[in-house]
Amino acid sequence: MNPEQNDQRAPNIRNVCFYSFNFQDALSHLRLVGPANHLGLKVIYGVENGQVFPDRAQMGDVIVLQRDFPRAFEAYQAIQKIAKSKQIPLVLDIDDLLFELPDDHPDRLQHNFSATLLPTFLAMLEADLITVTTHALRDYVIDFNKNVVVLANYLDDLLWQPKTPLLTPQPDSKIKIGYMGGHTHQPDLTLILPVIAQLSQQFAGRLEFHFWGTQPPEGLSGRQDVHWHKEVTWNYHDFAINFQAQSADIFMAPLTDNLFNRCKSSIKYLEYSALGVPGVYSRLEPYNSVIKHGVNGLLASNDEEWRDCLVSLIENPELRQSIATNATADLSSNWLLSEHASLWLSAYQEARETMTSKIDADLKMSTMLRNISQQIVAMDRFTKDQLKQKSDRIIELEHQVAQHEATIEGITSSRTWKLALLFRRMREAISPPKR
């Protein structure tokens, strides 16, 4: 932190109390920890080892809740009460439109966020300010809370050092086409599966497909030209170090067209560009607003366009270098966190101002939503407890079965048992049983 950044701090914003269940993941780093590091703000962590400490909320000049934190509903209510009584602005940060998860999204199929949706909606109504990653997300949220600020995701240049694009590979080298992302992106990868299969045949022996994080789609696993790097970590600091050590010639960023994906940020563009690698991106809002087709990236919206874009980059190393160079220049000019961290400070200062003028959510509706949320959270907890009890019982029974099997094995392998069997056979031979 330099003195100029220190001078940026508003007099009333020095300590931020942050509630998240994972302070080391990408979400927490991009949305608060990284900006706070650049600004010299002290982050007071409200959760340790899964235990929530609501009282720490009063230590902050502003309180920030990470998207689905309100699922800890009793803790959320205590924090909200402290914020109101102590006149501390309460900020809810939302980076994904969890209310609109597609039917085939893994998180929806596994109900990972089902129990948190209503508590999060209540927090969205009650927050003094909501910070979001994109304008599309703002347009959705603003119907429920007028105090919304867009804080885009930026590349933290304390962790990332953008590379100079190179003219690669050598004529006899294979071209590496890569994808990086979590397991929830399987439906997106399925979108371009036919294209990958076509390219693999068209350029047989010349291509390698690399997947960092998520498993290659079904139909690609086990192929010699497909490589899975599953060791990608959830710790964002370690991930940044690890991913910058990787190499590729072309990156892909497919997204299926739905409201959930249209509200996503362009973070993949930033991280791909940091490696000095050109990319092909879905022609959707996360990328439409930051990528100029043919200049700092390529955009595709159907199989034919995906194939044409990838083929053009495969066959033209000069185009790869040109696009990568432009993307890296755009990254350095417009997307470094060091140049935009002050936006977080401005947003938190705005939260202090809107707190005094914000119209409270309708009391009757808030009370109803709070009661429903309590019941949903209690039901979710009850269900999980029941599942744990059944799981523990299954483990106990399996242990008992193993013990009985060991006992039986001991009996049947003993000398006494073998002699008993011998005598039985002898008796049956002397006096066969009557039919």
Would you name each region that the model predicts?
Residues 187, 233-271, 280-289:
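Nucleotide-sugar-dependent
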Residues 18-39, 154-246:
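Conserved catalytic-core segment of nucleotide-activated headgroup transferases in glycan assembly
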Residues 126-163:
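Donor nucleotide-sugar binding/catalytic pocket of nucleotide-sugar-dependent glycosyltransferases
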Residues 1-70:
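N-terminal pre-catalytic "stem/leader" segment of glycosyltransferase-like enzymes
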Residues 353-435:
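Boundary detector for helix-to-coil junctions that initiate low-complexity/charged tails
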Residues 291-304, 312-318:
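Conserved acidic donor-binding segment of nucleotide-sugar-dependent glycosyltransferases
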Residues 81, 110-129:
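Membrane-proximal helix-turn-helix segments that form the acceptor-binding/catalytic region
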Residues 318-349, 353, 360-370:
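A charged, aromatic-enriched C-terminal amphipathic alpha-helix characteristic of glycosyltransferases
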